Amino acid sequence: MHVSMQTIHRLEQMQELLEQLDPDAPPQALVAPGSPLPRGEIIVFPGSFNPPTTAHLALLKQARHFARLEAVRGRGSMQLYAALSKHIVDKETVERPLLLDRILLLDNLLRRRFPHAGILLFNRGLYVEQAQAVHTAFPQVRRLLFLMGFDKIVQILDPHYYEDRDAALHDLFALAELLVAPRGNEGEHSLDELLQRPENQPFARYIHTLPFDPAYREISSTQVRQHASMHQHEIPGEVRRFMRETRAYAPPLRLPDGTEIDFYALRVKLLETLLRNVSCEK
């Protein structure tokens, strides 16, 4: 199993950043190596990206189009970021691949597909905490929009997630706006209906609809993880290569004698050893 020195160096940089993120500390945001420093107006797309799919890329492309339209309207240029959290709300049970590998994979993908986009890393999973982290870490950010699918806005507006929903939403929308794309059968009309409810109307002006091609609305990272062979057309080439080379989503390989080899577990051990050795040499 070969890992280039360039990859080791990038992994080391990412690992150093991850070690700075403490889930028990106040909200933190860090910018990944090679990413532009956030300033002005930014769009942030938080996700687990496990793995990145063609839907993720299509959504980023649509957000880039939104940013260009905003610039034409005189709002100024907008920076685009994908974001991962060291603490993913409601997704803690998904363990592989390593967050380190996911960051590296996402970085490779963005460098080729969206060279002007960046990656942010958070220590918290809630949108309001991530918004606090952005404004604290990057005070030159004037306007923050979170990019998300329709299922997320339903959760955000659901009173069952809060002790005091309206107070929590006021805290969120004092710091950020939301850019919402259709998901599944829930399109722009569904979002309009949701925002027209009396309890949601006070917050409607902070929530913007992002048109999204229906061809991508049903694509799911979960389906790709569980049934990759059935969803090859939904997986970017760079991701297919990562999956093939690391077997991060594949079960252990069973040999004729009954023994099993977990190739991704071997990769994890190798990376831990390499990073430990590099750290000791400093």
Give the predicted meaning of each segment.
Residues 1-282:
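Nucleotidyltransferase catalytic core that binds NTPs
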